[in-house]
Amino acid sequence: MNVIEISNIAAACGKNPYEDRQKIMLLLLCRKYKEIYKKEMKKIGIIEYISHDIKTFDTEIKEMYSEHKRNVTNPKEFKQIEKNITDKIKLKKEITKKDLDYAKIFIESSLKKDCGTNSEKTVIKKQLYTKGNNCMFSFVNNEYNWTIRGFHDATDNDIVIEIKTRMKQQNVRRNEYDLYQLFGYLLAMNKTRGKIVQYFNDIVYDSDIPTFTEFGIIDITVEPCKSKFEEFIKELNLFFQELNTYSDTHLINIEDIIKKNEWPIALYDTTDTPHNISPAYEKIINSI
């Protein structure tokens, strides 16, 4: 059975402009054929093995960042936090430009993710929602051999709430990929109504009716959402049909997905431990 996280559904259906459909396919194939894809990535040069005398600083960078992880709630804080950490890491004698480049990418990616997580708590408290993330919900499609699973953010009575923290005012908008993620939770939780709630600059956008920037309450039993939801199911089926054309002898073209200018996406030491993992490919590295 092929399993996909609900957070990856929009990309799998080709609706996420920031995450390629084939990349999600590669992730699932890496989980299924771990050693085969790891060996192939090593042969191509997508991952590199380093000798014992080469030092990496990713562990120290993560430790420095951990001081800020639980407290960041405002995108305006990002630049100062990044500067504080990079100033500290620059004091290390053996630090290289590559290490600093990795630090910048890791910090930027982590700040966005953790700011979103921390802001969810604020929104849930403000709006008096019932907090989610208390159990894993899943849905199994036996006909096409796939399972979706995930933890929802919150509920408001019978309405499933998906919270999105925006980094800029212009990002407060209706995104199709957010809608697809909500569809995934509705399917997994066996619910029919949901709402995408946005948060920016201490303002919660939670209109029940559609506006220029908000979907309002989504009801998959009523048009136009009913047809859109049916289309979503078809696209998910097509994704898994294509995924099943690959095997342990017929691999997906990795070089088409991970471009050469992004290599290496991780450095492996002599104990086979990965370091300097590219945040964009962290799930893939963790899968192998």
Descriptions of predicted regions:
Residues 1-288:
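Accessory terminal regions of nucleic-acid processing enzymes
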